[in-house]
Design a protein with these regions (language model features):
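Active-site-adjacent pocket scaffolds in enzyme catalytic domains
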Residues: 1, 17-19, 71-173
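Short, well-structured secondary-structure segments
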Residues: 1-56, 179-183, 190-191
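A general structural detector for well-ordered alpha-helical segments in enzyme core domains, enriched
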Residues: 35-39, 64-72, 95, 165, ...
Length: 211
């Protein structure tokens, strides 16, 4: 927030009994933990948005999405409308339809896993077409253009190269007054990863009004 940038923080809110697969694929924190509730309030009152980070198996299940959304809302104390599917798990046929059925209204799942870019071919938010209902889906979508792993795991950039790479994508979006999402996982800001310097460079580029 000190950089003049607000964000959407997505939280996992699973309440089912853990199976081995869920231990392996999903986060392990408890959204009803009092310390996490305090963090949710702090984010909300600092002007940020809180969204749902559904479980690995929720991408095609509206009831599961609705249940997880409700659990997060109970901890947050207000309505949740944003989401991004875990592991970017997504189906053109089912995911948007089930998100809308669950009461979610904004999704930022659509992106490439291993490279940066506009997967919907343009820097804009939109309501995708529902071929089953012959009308638009009742959910808005924003393409996620950059993910932290694109910069470190899928490319062998130097620090300067990463900075230039990020800035070029941000400039491209700003030039057309577009809309896009940038995905950064909070655990990579720890000393174990040390990606915090690049995260701060990204915030500076976003807030730089001269770009």
């Amino acid at each position: 927030r000190s950089a003049g940038v607000s964000a959407v923080y997505h939280f996992y809110s699973e309440q089912r009994r853990k199976t081995f697969k869920r231990w392996l694929m999903d986060p392990s924190y408890e959204i009803k933990n009092e310390r996490l509730k305090i963090l949710l309030y702090e984010l909300k009152y600092a002007g940020h948005k809180v969204g749902l980070h559904p479980t690995y198996d929720a991408w095609n299940d509206s009831e599961l999405l609705k249940e997880q959304k409700k659990t997060l809302e109970e901890s947050l104390g207000s309505k949740v409308t944003y989401c991004r599917q875990h592991w970017l798990r997504f189906s053109w046929k089912d995911t948007w339809l089930n998100q809308a059925r669950s009461g979610l209204t904004q999704d930022s799942t659509l992106m490439f896993n291993d490279r940066s870019g506009f997967r919907n071919s343009c820097a804009t938010s939109w309501k995708p077409w529902n071929p089953k209902g012959h009308k638009e889906h009742q959910i808005g979508c924003i393409s996620s253009v950059i993910m932290d792993s694109h910069l470190f795991d899928y490319n062998n950039f130097s620090c300067c190269e990463r900075n230039e790479y990020m800035r070029n994508w941000i400039i491209e979006c700003k030039k057309v007054h577009g809309t896009c999402s940038l995905l950064w996982h909070p655990h990579t800001l720890t000393k174990d990863y040390g990606w915090d310097e690049d995260y701060n460079m990204m915030l500076e580029a976003i807030s730089d009004k001269e770009l």
